[in-house]
Amino acid sequence: MKSLLFSILLIYLIQLVRSEECTDKHIHCFFWSQEGECEVNPRWMKKHCQKACGTCSLTSPTPLTRQQDVPTARTFDDQQDRQFLPSRPSSIPEGCNSVMTVEAETRRIFSSGQLTARFRQQMCAEEQVAPDCSINQCFHKKYRSMDGTCNNLQNPVKGAAFTAFTRLMPAAYDDGFNTLVSASRRNRPNPREVSVFLLSSERSLPGHVNSLLMLFGQFVSHDITSNAAQNFCGCQNSGPMCASIFAPPSDRSRRCIPFTRSFPICGTGQFGRVREQLNMNTAAIDASLIYGSEAITARSLRFAAMLRTSMIGGRMFPPNTNPGSLTAGDGRAILFVGLAALHTSFLRLHNNVAARLQNMNRHWNADRIFQESRKIVGGIVQVITYQEFVPELIGDASKTILGAYNGYNPNVEIGVLNEFAAGAYRLHGMIQETYPLVNSQFQEVNRYRFIDGVNNINHVLNNIDAIYRGMMTVPVRSPQRLTTSVTERLFGGSVDMAAVNIQRGRDHGLRSYNDYRRFCNLRPITSFNDWPEVPDENVRQRIGQLYRTPDDLDFYVGGILEQPAAGSLLGATFACVIGKQFERLRDGDRFYYENPGVFTSPQLAELKRTTLSWVLCQTGDNMVRVGRRAFDIENGSRAVPCSSITGLNLEAWRE
């Protein structure tokens, strides 16, 4: 009898041990199983996600060592011995009974696609309708809305998606309210002529930082700006929305560059109401290009606490629902191969954070985990922007222009400036002709042309690490001239970005270069021969041949030609305007990461330790070494192991 009982007990214990040993070997197994990956990729999932796929059996071989639920070596620095307060402040906002994680809909919501279709039908863009922030006040006290409304509780649409770009100075149109500058008065040169004669050059002057800076700058641009424009005008069209650029007779490479004006906000551009343009993205730096700038898109990208993914080769990517595309919160995710890589990295970062929070705070529901993860990722993007990107872009003047942070100011206009979006931040001159693909030993293994990486995700699906390392090794191009890749060969040669940038500035009513010099307390130029910021006499002579007087000079042209200031990639005028914009995005954002109460003190300390290098280590395919400072030019000699790159410890979020 005793031996029988012993045998039964032994069998039970063996079953128990084996059932415990049947584990998921990856942190995202449950999420992938819910997405149908057990059926789509059965071989890989059965090997790595037995428990999630329900393929455990007593006949399964017993692993020699217990596999851990979550990766530990390279994920988050929770092994490091850092002390956190034993009792944390309440996460419930003041005046609320609980943490509200869902924003109740109080108005009809449209997707970006639906709104764009309406704009095309009406030939004008409707602005966002202000919600009643008091209805969801406990949600708004803790989390951002998807469309940016109620960031400013006194003015709910300030900085929200689908609201007007703002201005530093009143608009300038030929007729005072609608017609492009120089369209009727002819006081400025043909944009294509300016591009060919002045701005386009195959000569590349290296900047002091690497090409990741260009890439991250584009990432930030797509986070905070999306112009309501559609390219439906051909060169044969002459309607009120069309302003195509006809090349001068001497231009042998093309006859015309199609150009469609940005949709005006409905009711503007008419006598008595100056034409204004719509920003379809949230103004705040909030990672909206990952999550979407309105609720419908956001819901389509989300599964419970996670962001939806496609598993390709055992790796996570943004949904690959159509061949050759990736679906993200912004429709321009695959505009360039490097941009698609960053979309992939920050999607992986969200899902890594969400999985860790899910394991750490099992009492949190999916909405709480999603909102906290989104808040953390948005905070990380802000940290990289203000601690790494802006100082390298603007240089020594960044601290003076932005000033010290003194907390949230609801009176600051957070909206994106027309002068920024349609002028100073159009830094296509940073783009190089070609980029290398570099292996883990920092050896070049292949090279691709920039134009071949446009709307092409093949390199991303193969190895995003090689893309990043290639960007690290190549100096960013000084933006004072544009490579012929973007003036002569982009999109099959149909687009000249220099000419388009000039025309877009005129379309958006930007004033002259001298007007913005005065705004920035810089001496306006009275003669092209007396222009210290442009020391090249040949360049000044060419400008004089194109423009009649300095007061006619386009803001974009004058700003981009300025010699970079100390430690900067930009001249003084562009540095001023871009600095003012980032100051507004910081001071006018109630959820800016340093604003007291947005994060606890331990959480804030952890966020400040994150860097772009850390993000690349956490989210690469198998990133082994990086430069400690992501924007420093790196040939491998100073690269350090990813294990030495410190970053976020999520213990500060344990409840």
Swiss-Prot record:
It catalyses: 2 a phenolic donor + H2O2 = 2 a phenolic radical donor + 2 H2O. One of its GO terms (molecular function) is heme binding. It is an enzyme of class 1 (oxidoreductase). Residues 22-56 form the ShKT domain. Heme b binds at residue 428. Exclusively expressed in hypodermis. The active site is at 222 (proton acceptor). Its EC number is 1.11.1.7. GO terms for cellular component: extracellular space. Keywords: Disulfide bond, Heme, Immunity, Innate immunity, Iron, Metal-binding, Oxidoreductase, Peroxidase, Signal. Belongs to the peroxidase family. XPO subfamily. This is Peroxidase skpo-1. It comes from Caenorhabditis elegans. The gene is skpo-1.
